[in-house]
Amino acid sequence: DARKGFEQELAKEGYKDGKNLKIDYVNAQGDQSNLKTMSQQLQKDKNVLNLAIATPAAQALQKQDSKTPMLFTAVTDPKSAGLVNNVTHPDTNATGVTDKVDTAAQIKLLHKMFPKAKKIGLLYNAAEENSVVQIKTAKKVIKSLGLTPVEKTVATTNDVQQTAAAWAKQSDAMYSPTDNVCAAAMNTIGKVTESAKVPVVTADAT
């Protein structure tokens, strides 16, 4: 858990919430429409430092407040997301760590595990730059293996049940990137694909 890890590291340095540190914690609860309001509230709070977990949260917060120092984590590609112009030497108010995975290797692993699968389903939120970057790579690798990518997009967790059901019927195997909407609805995806007897490989440990 990114938040817990951050707090644990602060504690190691002698900073503890409620003693010599105050932490304002807000959670979108899987609904990205809440991010703008949350970012506005954090800006009003005039914090010394903000931590954004995941690409959509970091983008929303930086758009609202480009001055307060911001750390980000669980961001796949900070440059493509517009958070920094240079990942080696960040030149904005933001810096942090990425959770970028080797998408090509994961697709090749999927193919090795399920060699008879010819149609590979790809489920993601097209509004998440982190997902778009991974899907672009996934499609390229899938095609290079002589397979067919089957794309389906979701905007919120409410879309997942119906979309995943249609997705499962059209796919022999499925791949889900480090996508926040999909991660929040992974139980639903698991139930749908299990029922359809379609294997799933995910980039997110969730």
Give the positions of each predicted feature.
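Short hydrophobic alpha-helices and adjacent helix-cap/hinge residues
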Residues: 1-206
